[in-house]
Swiss-Prot record:
Flexible linker: annotated segments: 147-155
GO cellular component: cytoplasm; Holliday junction resolvase complex
Free-text note regarding domains: Has three domains with a flexible linker between the domains II and III and assumes an 'L' shape. Domain III is highly mobile and contacts RuvB.
Xref: InterPro entries: DNA_helicase_Holl-junc_RuvA_I, Hlx-hairpin-Hlx_DNA-bd_motif, NA-bd_OB-fold, RuvA, RuvA_2-like
Name of the gene encoding the protein in the UniProt record: ruvA
Organism placement in taxonomy: Bacteria, Bacillati, Cyanobacteriota, Cyanophyceae, Synechococcales
MF term (GO), any: four-way junction helicase activity
Name under which the protein is recorded: Holliday junction branch migration complex subunit RuvA
Organism: Prochlorococcus marinus (strain SARG / CCMP1375 / SS120)
Length: 222
């Protein structure tokens, strides 16, 4: 099973509602379907690292790729639910960043889940029933009871995911670290540690940190 690819972007392709990238790895070209927001980040990138799930079908196999391991692993959890296929799982991830989707499932936010095209009330309820207690390991989170409801505490180092994503997009580690430091100074949302890594405070998700980091990198280069 293919689970990870490192290679050069040849072209971006589109087939109906599905979009993706052709990536060349050791002389072999792989067509990989991606989330729309992932494609938007790949416009200026040549060398890619993708976390991949391989779907086996009667007419062949299909590769679905993600820019970080969290999204790939969450995708695998989603398709383990009865009635949730690969394309519906992609639709859920298109509508909600991984951290928000995990929160919606663990907190039983049926309305948020059904706002995704193709997800009815029964499917949303199955997602909650089957996954509610199976997602905390994905982001190193812990669940605790607070006022009779579940509250999700993030203990993951989101900065590591953002750093990995930006390195995959050909940004230099030095400019990423500089952007992190600037964001730390301006918001105090990132705490510098002895190993010169960063721990994101609770409440700051992947999408927010990625956006803020890119703003600072692009401002510096512009």
């Amino acid at each position: 099973m293919i689970s990870w690819l490192n290679g050069l972007k040849i072209e971006i392709w589109e087939n109906g509602t599905r979009k993706g990238v052709l990536i060349s790895c050791s002389g072999v070209g792989y067509e990989v379907q991606l989330l729309s927001r992932s494609l938007q980040l790949l416009n200026t990138s040549k060398e890619l690292i993708l976390w991949v799930h391989e779907v086996h079908r009667e007419d062949g196999s299909q590769l679905i790729g993600f820019l970080n391991k969290l999204e790939r692993d969450l995708f695998r959890k989603l398709i383990s639910v009865s009635g949730v296929g690969p394309q519906l799982a992609i639709s859920l991830l298109e509508k909600n960043p991984a951290e928000q989707l995990i929160s919606a499932i663990t907190k039983k936010k049926i309305a948020q889940l059904t706002s995704c095209p193709g997800v009815g009330k029964k499917t949303a309820e199955r997602l909650v029933i089957e996954l509610q207690n199976k997602l905390s390991d994905l982001i190193g989170s812990s669940l605790k009871k607070t006022n009779n409801h579940l509250e999700l505490e993030y203990e993951t180092n989101v900065a590591d995911e953002v750093r990995s994503t930006l390195l995959n997009l050909d940004y230099k580690n030095s400019e990423i670290e500089k952007a992190f430091l600037e964001f730390e100074t301006s918001s105090k949302s990132i705490r510098s540690k002895a190993q010169e890594s960063f721990e994101v405070s609770k409440g700051l998700d992947f999408e927010t940190l990625l956006k803020e980091t890119l703003i600072r990198i692009n401002t510096e280069s512009g």
